[in-house]
Amino acid sequence: MTARRLGRFAIAALAALLAIGATGCMILEMKERELLYRPMRDYARTPADVGLAFEDVWIDVASETGDGRERVHAWWLPSGKPGAPAILYLHGIRWSLGSNLFRIARWRELGFNVLAIDYRGFGRSDGDLPSEMQIYADARAAWHELVRREPHSELRFIYGHSLGAAVALELGATVDDAAGVIAEAGFTSVADLVAESYAPLNLLVSQRFDALERARVLKAPALFIHGTADRFVPPAMSEKLFAVAPQPKKLHMIEGANHGNWNGAGLDDYRRVILEFVASARERVRATRG
């Protein structure tokens, strides 16, 4: 979340407080959702554009009102290799699958089967403006789809970037059949991000994404990754997530990498750390089974 967007939220919050009672709360929450989420309807690029085989997947989810069904769009990118690990890819607060293609392709290059989803309101998924609870529900539904496609728990992993890291930690604290969770460029909570510049407006945040609390109760090994040159999410937040997470866990700071690591800093070490983590997590599941 950029400083400009935080500023817009602060102005919106103060304006909303002028409205009294429930109406004011409703205005504040809706304005917050409008400023926080930046859904993009980007259909232009697909994995085929970078030479990767893929399948369009549609996942049913309950509507926000609970009286109907909506669909979440996903890509399934098979590695074509027997015994390859599978990862659920959860993107950040902006863009859509097409705009995340370069990062999704990295996982395929590492040899993973990849299930990457667009939350409701993003890309080709149904819905307009998502909410925190909807995004969590979308991730859980996508996890069920991954489990259906990959029956072996030692091969199933969860990955999230930025906002997606918070979603990954929530999912990793909920399901008990993931081999590991990888959280990249994660924040401790949206409220903490707001407090960085506009405290005490953090008390008004309804879309909290309290990743710190979810990290405390993770049910799987965790790898936390953060770039030291991240200007959007302080690297210290990943250090805090790491500090509260139960063992086994690992923290890897990428020297010189920005929030999206567009500059490709430390990619060799990035790949090595991920593959070592995955190998260790898989072995741990096997050992647990005896």
Q: Across the structure, where does each feature detected by a protein language model lie?
A:
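An N-terminal hydrophobic leader/cap segment in hydrolases
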Residues: 20-63
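Membrane-embedded segments
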Residues: 66-145, 149, 172
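Short alpha-helix in the alpha/beta-hydrolase fold that links the catalytic acid
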Residues: 103, 220, 234-243
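Alpha/beta-hydrolase fold nucleophile elbow
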Residues: 150-162
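Hydrolase active-site cap/lid region
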Residues: 165-220, 268
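Short beta-strand/loop motif that positions the catalytic acidic residue
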Residues: 217-219, 224-226, 230
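Acidic catalytic loop of the alpha/beta-hydrolase fold
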Residues: 228-233, 259-261
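Catalytic histidine-centered segment of alpha/beta-hydrolase-like enzymes
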Residues: 257-267
